[in-house]
Amino acid sequence: MMANYFRSTFKFRKTTVSTLFVLTVLVISILTWFDANKYKSNLPDDKSSNSLLDAAWHDLQVITEKPHPYTSHFNDNVHDYLLQRVEQISKKSKFIEVSDDSANGVSKLFQHLDVFNDSSTETRLVYYESSNILVKVEGKSPQLPGLLLSAHFDSVPTGYGATDDGKGVVSLLALLQYYSENQPERTIVFNFNNNEEFGLLGATIFTYSEWFKLVSYVINLEGAGAGSKAALFRTSDTATALLYEKSVKDQPFGNSIYQQGFYSRFVSSETDYKIYELNGLRGWDIAFYKPRDMYHTGKDTVQHTSKAALWHMLNIAWQLSKYVVADQTTASQEILDDESNSSPAIYFDIISKWFFVVSARQLYVWNIVLLCVLPITLILLRIVCNKLGTWRMPTSALFTRIPFALFVSSFTIYFTKELLLQLNPTIWSRNFILPFLFCISEFLLINTLVLALFEYLWPIQDFKTLSLLELSAIAWLFLLKCTWDLSSSGFKATGVYPVTVFYLFISLASMFGLCSMCFGKRPNATNDYDNSEFMRPDTNDTHSIECPRQPEDSETTETSPLINTPSSSVQSSPIASSKSLPGAVQYLQRTLNYDWSAQYLLAVPINAFLIWESLFNLFDALSMTVQESNKATEAVFKFAIYGAIFLCSPLLPFTTKLNRFVVIILGVVTILAASFSLFAAPYTELAPLKLRFVQRIDISRETKQNVEIYGRAGANIQEVLSSLPSRPNVSCKDSGSGTELCVYEGMWPNFGIPMKVDVVKNTHNDKEHFEYEPYFADLRINVADNRLCLMKFNTTGKKHLKQVEFKVGNETTTHSYRTDEGIDSLLLHKLSWNVPYYDVQLKWIPQYTAEGSSDTLGVSIDCYWGEFDETIVNGQVVQKIPAYNELLQFLPETFIVSNRESGMVTIHKYLEL
């Protein structure tokens, strides 16, 4: 009885397959939710950790009281508070030394690489006055290569910087507290750096420090979102990834798909890690990455994050740094020195519990082995099945059903993508799960209907094994392409590992099906091809049909039917012939009637979970970028379509066994998800549209000012801005790539026009100037209460400017830079708010061509102010930038504002010398 119950329960039938499918979906959903929320309940329970966390949380509240960009006065307050905390922590430790760049007058003029554009040929000069706070914790073994811990304490003008990068900064304070009481083996240098947001300058200036020579490794803490979990964005190589794996046992989180985004420049932004990497350090870039709708806005506050998120970053940095500098210095150094670990790493976590690392070079070797061994094995098994006569499917069945179903379903979701692009392209920024679920359910539904129709009209012996073989062949081609990409990219295509896993498990499932077929019931010697065995679409077994038995004395006569029916004698002949087989073979035949379950478990759950987790993390990071450009939108849609196909493909061999209830549910889910995706409002209070603000004052000829708002086209920005209380006259125009620029005359800032440019001398107008003699011009840029100005040259021709000299205020030091390649721009910073001007001397050489000489130098000067808080004018408290405050107060809740440039207000002056 139990045997019959077992057979009836676990046969390859619709109820069983449907139940297993539903269980797979439920388990993956539960694991995903658990993974996304587990960190919230993972706060420390020991006293020392709680003490560090509480202190860090208090520090975070203090430094995020106001926005604090480099161009703000409150930036100095944050610097002073951090310096006071650092000195308080380190005063009792004899092995700690503190250095303040601001007090030491650290400044530098240097040519700055364009880290956002590797192909740039511009000569960009930067003069930077630093206020970094450096702390050296001397190690017990100072001869060992040291570790740098880095985070930046500046914010953007519109953000309070709780996550970007307040949590990184206070995590460093907590780690400093720990290492002040527990001297490490390696030397640690802490870099609390300033002005990361607009040029990564705090990290750059540190590379000129003597303490930079002490370190070989870096842990950079960053915030590219507004909370949740801190991900391992990227790491230098397999050795550093292995150290993360060995050290971070509590809540590891990261995926090398993110790393490939940086390698390929798909991710256009950068962090301080890039500067350290370019200067020879190896290490880890650990960052918050979501939600981007709060990133660089007024919602990047303590109120919109949590202690749990702070603890996640602090705990990871603590575990990793302890392993490297204290607990396992010898073991870690052996791993770091191992040349076999020098290639880029492929890594990923499983539900923040297990972390897996493999060398990209090693994966390349494995791919080649799999590409060679698995197809040969499958071909040999196929030949064996032919020899044994157990393969009884016509050749015409090969590469027809699955390719046709994939074509129809792919065409359908491509049409859906185009429809969604037209009607609601930015719905992903509100909720990426439902649009993606729409793609998944639609793809599955179309394939189920098409393949079920095939099976009804043209049933075959073992559709699932045939389909798995076809999928294996298709996956082989994709793996070949990925392996080529892995090699041609210098092993930097670190996001291709899901294709390897997919091909491996699909091939194993195919292999199992062929092995089962080898032990299947063979046809009667007198009837080599008994089509009736597999012509019923509702068959419950894999290779044979359970049919009513004929009486044993039944014989074939002249009146027997020409085509056997289920009650004909030939149907019983395999059963009769099987009695002559050995008992072990008969047992295998009975057991392998349930081979479908092994094939399902090999092909579906592991692939589905790994692919879903990768896609979920990818959409989590990228879904809100649809607001930024058409390119980003196209990328998200591409990931959705290819991701849905990739995710659902392992299930296709089993879709013909999904019962009508599952099919109905798929249909309902498709309709509901489609309705939401096509018609729901893309922006809400919890998922607002981000607008980018700058107020530009032009004093080139007549003084005029405009507010410029950049945002996603098609979001009724003009209508919303026109309804502001000031009733501005708004004009909008396309700014390219799916965005628009809206301009209107806003309310004037309440700090006057604190910029004036005087041309003190210009030899271009000197009548005694010789024809081939260089020109000189002396400028004085008067800027009160300012820290940042940008000069751009050659705006009327080629690179004429060859030399620049300048002084900051009345200081005696002259800074000079000369290059025959020409200078494109000069970025000037000064820490003192009381220094009223820059004196700049420019030297340029006229260009002589057949058409004549070109000797005019164009100079564009922009100075930035980054504060929008209150000020006192004529005894009254007023807003510094009322145009911005009007937006904050009166924009609908579905909009949020970020900065467009380095300051909230830009004053512009153009000269021709």
UniProtKB/Swiss-Prot annotation:
Residues exposed to the Vacuolar side: 37-364, 416-431, 487-494, 622-634, 682-913
Family per record: Belongs to the peptidase M28 family.
CDD domains on file: M28_Fxna_like
Cellular compartments annotated: Vacuole membrane
Keyword terms of this UniProt record: Glycoprotein, Hydrolase, Membrane, Metal-binding, Metalloprotease, Protease, Transmembrane, Transmembrane helix, Vacuole, Zinc
Region (Disordered): 540-578
Record field: compositional bias (Polar residues): 557-566
Organism: Kluyveromyces lactis (strain ATCC 8585 / CBS 2359 / DSM 70799 / NBRC 1267 / NRRL Y-1140 / WM37) (Yeast)
EC number, UniProt record: 3.4.-.-
Annotated site residue numbers, Transition state stabilizer: 295
Bias (Basic and acidic residues) ranges: 540-552
Membrane topology: Multi-pass membrane protein
Functional summary from the UniProt entry: May be involved in vacuolar sorting and osmoregulation.
Protein name (Swiss-Prot/TrEMBL): Vacuolar membrane protease
Ranges of the Cytoplasmic topological domain: 1-15, 386-394, 453-465, 516-600, 656-660
GO biological process, alphabetically ordered: proteolysis
Residues of the active site: 196 (proton acceptor)
SUPFAM superfamilies membership: Zn-dependent exopeptidases
One GO MF term attached to the UniProt entry: metalloexopeptidase activity
Protein's UniProt keywords contain Lyase: no
Residues reported in the UniProt entry to bind Zn(2+) 1: 152, 164, 222
Biased composition (Low complexity): 567-578
